[in-house]
């Protein structure tokens, strides 16, 4: 048996596999063939994933009903609808990929594209809360002095990053960092689809190279989002909206989703899933990755249902509890004003 160097092992893990699966499932079956040859484990996992996705969609419909009836501003309503659709859309795409193994790549690309778009939406929602970029910068310069740049994803590598003096152009640069991420991701998605449909499995290396090239764009978008949210989170205006809760849910979901793909890919090439029984090794790993994505989407939807109830967030300004809180705050303000004048 020939021994290979650690470098050769790493190259094989990135571009090929350590398994010798000749004579087994080399081609990904069509959905009809796949569904006819399911084992008990696959049947049970598909049943669970379908039920969980139905639950996620039902909760999402409930969210959309509350958003429609209890949010006044149409543009704010649109932003929140787009964010509320993240988990159910990702769950549905993952479920479709479980039933149709050949579309796993398309499912992953579309989900990743939507996550990148959601980063920009969360910043647009922040700007809307403060009535635009100029109003946000004005309030920040009145109450804050520095911009927090020691934030993920670079704070772990550079924990001693200094605070930067707050300026309007720096906030604009952060916004542009976030905005470029979905644009670059859209271009990368289109190029990836061309490579995949043209070269199939032979396009693996170009796809990995493309992911590596576009990684700085994604990291810049995430970094810009974290800088803005971390800096603005110190302002009292955001507390009643629970905006930071919305951001943390999206951020954590995106992080887990993004890390799962390379982890499951590495495990499959290392041999953790064997040669596969119904599907090839790589597709078997992505099948289970999609299963976990469905579960994660449900957890995110359920947590958001509990933490972002209309009675707890000022986003739902037409909800009775929110109106009563607003009237109470205005009464306190009037009393303070009267006392100051006397």
Swiss-Prot record:
Residues on Cytoplasmic side: 72-79, 131-176, 230-243, 312-342
* Topology versus the membrane: Multi-pass membrane protein
Which residues belong to the signal peptide in this entry? none
List where in the cell it is found: Cell membrane
* InterPro entries xrefs: Ostalpha/TMEM184C (IPR005178)
Topology check: give the Extracellular ranges.
1-50, 101-109, 198-208, 265-290
Q: Which residues are glycosylated?
A: 20
Task: Name the residues that span the membrane.
Answer: 51-71, 80-100, 110-130, 177-197, 209-229, 244-264, 291-311
What keywords does the record list, in alphabetical order?
Cell membrane, Glycoprotein, Membrane, Transmembrane, Transmembrane helix, Transport
Q: Name one GO molecular function term.
A: transmembrane transporter activity
Q: Name one GO cellular component term.
A: membrane
UniProt family annotation: Belongs to the OST-alpha family.
Function text: Probable transporter.
Specify the protein name. Organic solute transporter alpha-like protein 2
* Originating gene: osta-2
